[in-house]
């Protein structure tokens, strides 16, 4: 049987995304109600990039599902060096029930998935952060109810993985997504096109703008992320100057709907992309969002493994 993979947000149809989110809500209420990895059965969790939330949430989640996480960093494997990714995928598929990988280029994940006979999950790539988006959607649903028809605004680096996932995952849920970013930091055109194609089937929309204030006006959800993503620290680009107008602060929050919520996938650079006042304020659901990485990823693993068996 060909495995189902989760490499980007639109790998799930709208109905499938809703199934995963419903299961995530159930698992949050009863963490041990699903045990698809009882045995324990193994899951490979591979890291080319450092992580806090991803590592803890996957390790704890796999244990709660009855399994054992085999956690390996890039220094400890031959991934893409002395052995091809395809050969590694074939071997790991004989050992584990799924492969979770936090890496750089999206094509590395695609190469792994192309040869694997077990599900491959994108735990973050340069292009997408789909597990985080599931957690975001779960948090939004908890605080806003139905997702369809909500208005969500992302402020900051529109070219980063969270902006891409917010577009694809958001419109899959029927959310109207606006990306507010300065010139030179807009989303990749191919991902904008993919999001708009998906939006045609859900009634959602994708809007791109350079006007942060106009983008924030009246929205239900405000989202931001770091201005400098992992691996960009030494690229020499001046990000603070163009991004200051996109800082998520009390002024921008005041433009949104009075019941609007604020999301940040963390880690946050307080005083840069988000102020302390907003991060710790009444609109923030950041900690619920972070917790939901555990529940959403457990639901995703369970859903994928059910289809594998």
UniProtKB/Swiss-Prot annotation:
It is an enzyme of class 2 (transferase). Pathway: Amino-acid biosynthesis; L-arginine biosynthesis; L-arginine from L-ornithine and carbamoyl phosphate: step 1/3. GO terms for molecular function: amino acid binding; ornithine carbamoyltransferase activity. It catalyses: carbamoyl phosphate + L-ornithine = L-citrulline + phosphate + H(+). The keyword Acyltransferase does not apply. Carbamoyl phosphate binds at residues 51-54, 78, 102, 129-132, 265-266, 293. It is found in: Cytoplasm. GO terms for biological process: arginine biosynthetic process via ornithine; citrulline biosynthetic process; L-arginine biosynthetic process. The keyword Metal-binding does not apply. Keywords: Amino-acid biosynthesis, Arginine biosynthesis, Cytoplasm, Transferase. InterPro entries: Asp/Orn_carbamoyltranf_P-bd, Asp/Orn_carbamoylTrfase, Asp/Orn_carbamoylTrfase_sf, Asp_carbamoyltransf_Asp/Orn-bd, Orn/put_carbamltrans, OTCase_ArgI. L-ornithine binds at residues 161, 225, 229-230. Its EC number is 2.1.3.3. GO terms for cellular component: cytoplasm. NCBIfam families: orni_carb_tr, PRK00779.1. Reversibly catalyzes the transfer of the carbamoyl group from carbamoyl phosphate (CP) to the N(epsilon) atom of ornithine (ORN) to produce L-citrulline. Belongs to the aspartate/ornithine carbamoyltransferase superfamily. OTCase family. This is Ornithine carbamoyltransferase. It comes from Mycolicibacterium paratuberculosis (strain ATCC BAA-968 / K-10).
């Amino acid at each position: 049987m060909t495995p189902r993979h989760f490499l980007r947000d639109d790998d799930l149809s709208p109905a499938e995304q809703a199934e995963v989110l419903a299961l995530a809500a159930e698992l949050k209420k009863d963490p041990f109600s699903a045990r698809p990895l009882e045995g324990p059965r193994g899951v490979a969790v591979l890291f080319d990039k450092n992580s806090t939330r991803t590592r803890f949430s996957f390790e704890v989640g796999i244990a709660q599902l009855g399994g054992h996480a085999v956690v390996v960093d890039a220094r400890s494997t031959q991934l893409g060096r002395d052995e091809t990714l395809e050969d590694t995928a074939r071997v790991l598929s004989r050992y584990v029930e799924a492969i979770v990988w936090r890496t750089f280029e999206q094509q590395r994940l695609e190469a792994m998935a192309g040869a694997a006979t077990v599900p491959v999950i994108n735990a973050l790539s340069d292009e997408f952060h789909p597990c985080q988006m599931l957690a975001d959607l779960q948090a939004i649903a908890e605080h806003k109810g139905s997702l369809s028809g909500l208005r969500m605004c992302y402020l900051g680096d529109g070219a980063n993985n969270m902006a891409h996932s917010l577009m694809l995952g958001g419109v899959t849920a029927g959310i109207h997504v606006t990306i507010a970013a300065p010139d030179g930091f807009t989303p990749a055109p191919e991902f904008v096109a993919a999001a708009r194609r998906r939006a045609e089937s859900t009634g959602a929309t994708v809007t791109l703008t350079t006007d942060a204030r106009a983008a924030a006006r009246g929205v239900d959800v405000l989202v931001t992320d770091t201005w400098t993503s992992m691996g960009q620290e030494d690229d020499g680009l001046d990000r603070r100057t163009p991004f200051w107008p996109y800082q998520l602060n009390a002024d921008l929050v005041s433009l949104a709907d009075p019941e609007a919520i604020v999301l940040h996938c963390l880690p946050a650079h307080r005083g840069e992309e988000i102020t302390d006042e907003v991060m710790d304020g009444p609109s923030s659901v950041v900690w619920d969002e972070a917790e939901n990485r555990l529940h959403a990823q457990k639901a995703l693993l369970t859903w994928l493994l059910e289809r594998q068996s």
